[in-house]
A protein has these predicted regions:
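Amphipathic, small/basic residue-rich leader segments at the start of a protein or domain
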Residues: 1-138, 158, 162, 366-375
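Alpha-helix capping/hinge segments and adjacent helical runs
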Residues: 4-15, 19-26, 258, 379-454
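A glycine-rich, basic-preceded beta-loop-alpha segment at the flavin cofactor/substrate interface
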Residues: 38-41, 243-246, 250, 262-294, ...
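Flexible, glycine/threonine-enriched loop-and-boundary segments that flank and lead into catalytic domains
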Residues: 83-110, 174-203, 207-218, 385-401, ...
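Glycine/proline-enriched, intrinsically flexible loops and inter-domain linkers
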Residues: 114-145, 153-186, 209, 235-237
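Internal maturation/activation junctions in enzymes
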Residues: 143-144, 155-191, 200, 355, ...
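A short core secondary-structure module
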Residues: 201, 205-247
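Extended amphipathic alpha-helical segments enriched in small hydrophobics
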Residues: 295-376
Length: 454
C-alpha cells in the first residue's frame, strides 16, 4: 500500500488552486514574472507558477502522510517539556520540523531575495490545511511562520535583512499578545516596555500567558511603551530575538488538546528588544494585521480538522459491520457523513475565497510600497481589503464551529469505540475544541464580521 498523500488524496484542493482569480493573484505577486531573470526557480508565466505551487503542495502532502501523520499519536502522548526556562519539543515534533525545513517549506510567502518562495497566501494556506489534517498541534508551530508577514509589512529594511532570511531558513516565531488580565481585551496589556538610553534599545519586563510556541527564535511582542496610559493607544509592537536572552518559559500549560504545541507562560526580565514600526500603533495597526493572518491560519487548521474527522468517520463506517452489513448503508449514518462532507466542502470554499481576497489586497499593498498605485489599482485594493476584512472572521468563525461539529459526529459514527483513546477521532475532537476559542472566540468573530454588513 502506498503512503497517503494529504494533497493528492483531496481533489478539492487542486480545484481551488485552479480558481480563475489565481491568474490576477500570480500576476500581482510575481510583478508580471520579473524574477525569472534573477532566480532559477522563479516562474516564467502563470502555468509555470501554478505548476510550482502544485509541486510544493505535493511535497507537503507527502511529508504530511509519511512523517507528520504517523508521528501525531506519539506527539499527543509525549508533548513538549519545560527545562531550565526552555522548551524541549516532543521527539516527533522535532522530526516534523526537520522534514519541513529540509524541504524548504519556510518563509513560503516571503520574497526570493530573502530566501523565501514568494508564494501567494492561497497555496501557503493550503499547506497549512494539509499539515493540520495530520497534526493540528504541529500545524501551530509550523504556520506561525506567517508572523513574518507582519514584520515584512511594518519593519524597516534593516530588520528585513536581519530577520526574514532566518525565518526562511527554518527558525520559528511566536506572537506574544495575551496576558493573565488581557485575553480578548488586548487593550489591557501591561507588559512594560522602557527605552534604555545607555544601550540604545528597548527593554521588556513582565509576564505573558498562553503564548503558543513561546520559546520561539523570534517573537513579536505587544507591550505598553507609553508611561501612564491605560488603553490601546499606549501599546507598541516589539521584536524580541531569543539570541539576546531575557525571556524564560516559566511553565507549559497542560491542555485538553493540541498537545504537541507548547503553550507557555513567559517571564521577561529586562529583555532587550527593538521597536517594530511606529510607537502607539502596536494594537490598532500591527496586531490587527497579525490577527487577520492568524485567523486565516485557524480557519485553515479547522478545515484540516474537519477533513480528518470526516476521513476517520467514513473509513470506520465502511469497515464496521452490524446487522450483517457495513453501517454506512444505514440511512442515519450515511446522512451524518453527507452533512459532514457538506460542512467540510462549504467551509473549504469559504476559506479559499477569503485567502484569494487577502492575496489580491496584500499584493497591491506590497506594490504600493514600491511605486504609486494607479487609480484602478487603488480601487481594486480598497475593494479586496474590505472583502478580506469581513470574510476573514467569517471563515474563522464558521470553520471552527464546523470542525467541532464534524469531530463530534465522527465520534458518534464510531459508537462506543469512539470513546476509546486508541481511535484517532478522540484526538481530533480534543484538538478541534480550541479552534472556536483562540485568535478570537466565535462570539468575537461574529462582531468583527457583522461590522461590514450593518
Amino acid at each position: 500500500k502506498t503512503m497517503a498523500n494529504f494533497y493528492t488524496d483531496i481533489p478539492e484542493l487542486k480545484y481551488h488552486l485552479n480558481n480563475p482569480m489565481m491568474q490576477r493573484i500570480c500576476e500581482l505577486k510575481e510583478r508580471g514574472y520579473e524574477d525569472k531573470d534573477k532566480f532559477d526557480y522563479a516562474p516564467q508565466d502563470y502555468a509555470d507558477a501554478i505548476d510550482s505551487y502544485d509541486k510544493v503542495l505535493e511535497i507537503t502532502g507527502e511529508i504530511t502522510g509519511e512523517i507528520i501523520a504517523p508521528n501525531a499519536e506519539g506527539v499527543d502522548e509525549e508533548g513538549p517539556h519545560c527545562a531550565n526556562g526552555r522548551v524541549e519539543y516532543a521527539s516527533g515534533t522535532k522530526q516534523n520540523l526537520d522534514a519541513m525545513v529540509k524541504a524548504g517549506l519556510n518563509g513560503m510567502t516571503m520574497p526570493r531575495r530573502f530566501g523565501g518562495l514568494n508564494f501567494p497566501i492561497t497555496p501557503y494556506t493550503m499547506c497549512a490545511e494539509i499539515v493540520a489534517a495530520a497534526d493540528a498541534g504541529f500545524g501551530n508551530i509550523w504556520s506561525l511562520q506567517d508572523c513574518i508577514e507582519t514584520l515584512y509589512e511594518f519593519g524597516n529594511e534593516d530588520q528585513h535583512s536581519r530577520f526574514i532570511p532566518r525565518i526562511c531558513a527554518g527558525e520559528t516565531m511566536s506572537m506574544d499578545l495575551t496576558e493573565p488580565d488581557a485575553g480578548s481585551d488586548l487593550q489591557s496589556v501591561m507588559l512594560k516596555a522602557t527605552y534604555d538610553e545607555a544601550n540604545n534599545c528597548w527593554r521588556l519586563n513582565g509576564v505573558k500567558r498562553f503564548i503558543t510556541n513561546g520559546d520561539a527564535d523570534l517573537h513579536l511582542v505587544l507591550a505598553r511603551s507609553e508611561e501612564g496610559t491605560k488603553d490601546g493607544r499606549g501599546l507598541s509592537m516589539f521584536i524580541y530575538d531569543k539570541r539576546d536572552g531575557g525571556v524564560n518559559v516559566r511553565r507549559i500549560e497542560n491542555k485538553l488538546g493540541i498537545h504537541g504545541s507548547p503553550t507557555c507562560e513567559l517571564v521577561y526580565k529586562n529583555a532587550k528588544c527593538e521597536l517594530c514600526g511606529d510607537r502607539k500603533l502596536g494594537l490598532i495597526k500591527y496586531v490587527m494585521a497579525l490577527m487577520n493572518g492568524a485567523r486565516l491560519g485557524i480557519a485553515a487548521q479547522s478545515v484540516g480538522l474537519s477533513q480528518a474527522a470526516y476521513n476517520e468517520g467514513l473509513a470506520y463506517a465502511k469497515d464496521r459491520k452490524q446487522f450483517g452489513k457495513a453501517i454506512i448503508e444505514f440511512p442515519a449514518v450515511y446522512d451524518m457523513l453527507a452533512i459532514m462532507k457538506a460542512k467540510l466542502d462549504a467551509g473549504r470554499a469559504l476559506l479559499y475565497q477569503t485567502s484569494r481576497y487577502v492575496d489580491i489586497y496584500k499584493a497591491l499593498d506590497d506594490i504600493a510600497r514600491e511605486r504609486k498605485l494607479t487609480p484602478e489599482e487603488r480601487q481594486e485594493q480598497k475593494k479586496y481589503a474590505k472583502l478580506a476584512d469581513s470574510f476573514t472572521p467569517l471563515a474563522k468563525g464558521m470553520n471552527s464551529e464546523y470542525a467541532n461539529q464534524n469531530a463530534y459526529d465522527s465520534i458518534q459514527i464510531h459508537g462506543g469505540s469512539g470513546f476509546m483513546l486508541e481511535y484517532a477521532c478522540q484526538r481530533i475532537y480534543r484538538d478541534a475544541r480550541i479552534t472556536s476559542i483562540y485568535e478570537g472566540t466565535t462570539q468575537l468573530q461574529t462582531v468583527a464580521a457583522i461590522r461590514y454588513v450593518t
